[in-house]
Amino acid sequence: MAGETTITVIGNLTNDPELRFTPSGSAVANFTIASTPRTFDRQASEWKDGETLFLRASVWREMAENVAGSLTKGTRVIASGRLKSRSYETKEGDNRTVVELEVDEIGPSLRYANARVNRTQRSGNQNTRRTGDGSPGDAGQTASRDDPWAVNSPANAGSRSDGTDTEPPF
């Protein structure tokens, strides 16, 4: 990815993301982002819409599942990624080339909405500690202790498990 040009697109999803799985089991979500530029016409004192760009986009693996479970048709999103061209042959035998956005980062725009973010457990056991018998331990509490940005439950807010106060002195 070093040296590759990334672009950012802000627009609305035209449909719910389509989640599929490859034969090897990798998740992929495909969707279209519609982005319409708006300019202010001083003569008419009104906003004018430009031509809408419909950009196909794809996202892979765990992020694909997160996108499919979080974003829906009409959601205003901010997506950043790399443009990739792909050639294919239609059923009629015609050769086609399309340009798609290979998404690196995506999220809802908070300009006209609000969102609650729920952190997911990462696959590959990066955040999960195992007990002696090989079964997962209390991953949520372990991850919270290891993560300085984790939110304490209200009952524990302001104090550590060792009884010392975590509130700053000011």
Curated annotation (Swiss-Prot):
The lineage of its organism: Bacteria, Bacillati, Actinomycetota, Actinomycetes, Micrococcales. The gene is ssb. One of its GO terms (molecular function) is single-stranded DNA binding. Residues 117-129 have a biased composition (Polar residues). Homotetramer. Residues 113-170 are annotated as: Disordered. This is Single-stranded DNA-binding protein. Residues 1-110 form the SSB domain. One of its GO terms (cellular component) is nucleoid. It comes from Paenarthrobacter nicotinovorans. The keyword Protease does not apply.
